[in-house]
Amino acid sequence: MYLRSRHLPRREMLKGLGVTLALPLLDAMVPAGRVWAQAPKLRLACVEIVHGAAGSTAFGLKKNLWAPAAVGRGFDLSSSSLSPLEPWRDWITIVSNTDVRSAEAFELQEVGADHFRSSAVFLTQAHPKQTQGSDVFAGTSLDQYYAKRFGQETPIPSMQLSIENVDQSGGCAYGYACVYTDTISWASPTEPLPMVRDPRVAFDQLFGVGATREERAARRLEDRSILDIVTDSIARLRKDLGAADQARLSDYLDNIREIERRLQRVEAYNSSGESRELPDAPIGVPDSFDEHAKLMFDLQALAFAADITRIFSFKLARDASSRVYPLSGSSAGFHNSSHHGDREALILDFEKINRYHVGLIPYFLEKLKNTPDGDSNVLENTLVIYGSPKGDPNVHNHKRCPLVLAGHMNGKLKGNLHLKAPDGTSMANVFLRLLHELGVDDVKSFGDSSGEFDLTTVPASATAGARG
């Protein structure tokens, strides 16, 4: 490949044997005499955490363990699980007091099955059909509505990632197929999309490493970076770039190489014969939840930077997970902790886990904010949805469910805002508004929506002391 001018097409790729490396947005990709595009493409990252929140309990509401007391802009996060987002308050919109009604039991035989139904509802806001067969039925998820409209503009329309085991098949419990628990992305009401748990698999998919599983395995045995395969192409490209583009390219390539090193360390340890906390996990899956989540966030940030895909869904845990999070300060398993028996001390212990999970999000936001995107940054042009389809997990209800939006969505969200929905408002109303802001404006209803929720205006009736 020889570049004869400083102008590059946006889809310029560096290709080598079994590798296709997309590039970040560079000044050289803007034709001479033109300015950066006025409306950068929006990215979407949907992050689900199961088991609701301590702040959705009666005690949690009183103590503002999730939603802050003040509605509007003068809110205090010091007592909230959202406190790790305080440095990012100008980038977040908290939407409290919404319900996920479609996750409730509609029939007597569905009672008690919330763990096996809820994740299918999060991004679809649709009530899943109770079946253990292949005739599953839920709804098209928010991320896939966006992917169908705009996903074909990128090499990969969308990607689905997860942390825990999501490859179970057949029926799980209470008459529900495991797929309802395994994924949050649905291409249609009958098409659940598989989620990728192994960071190495996600990396290989993003960077076109190997056409077959055998080719990818063989390349890993070579123990060299994908950048080594395209070294000559990188060198030729650099000659045609200005100083700013060279620095941007170097940062991008350094991030790729660092992720590769981390993946190699994980694989080396997991194949060393040392005992593992997750002995049944694929070789590329870290035992450390923290490292696993950060690798997945790093991959999303890289993909957004290079416009490989603009759409991710990310499942941080499997419903009914008993995983212990040592860094949270709680020694209880996630599921056991969520069944706190309405005891205040146990609710506060569960809140430690909620706070720990939220504490992972600033890592992602920092990556996005530090990634240039035209004359702005990627976080400015991204919507991150973080939430849960459960409210108080002790009683398996779906009221006052956690939901926070991050990023400015290309100016459509202003941040530094807490909005409290009227009692009985469906989370689907929020998602319908988000779909329209994402450009999917021909969708008239979503799940059990009854209208659109205004995401920028504080109601005149809101007071500084309003309870979240």
Q: Language-model features: where?
A:
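Ligand-binding pockets and gating/stacking loops
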Residues: 1-468
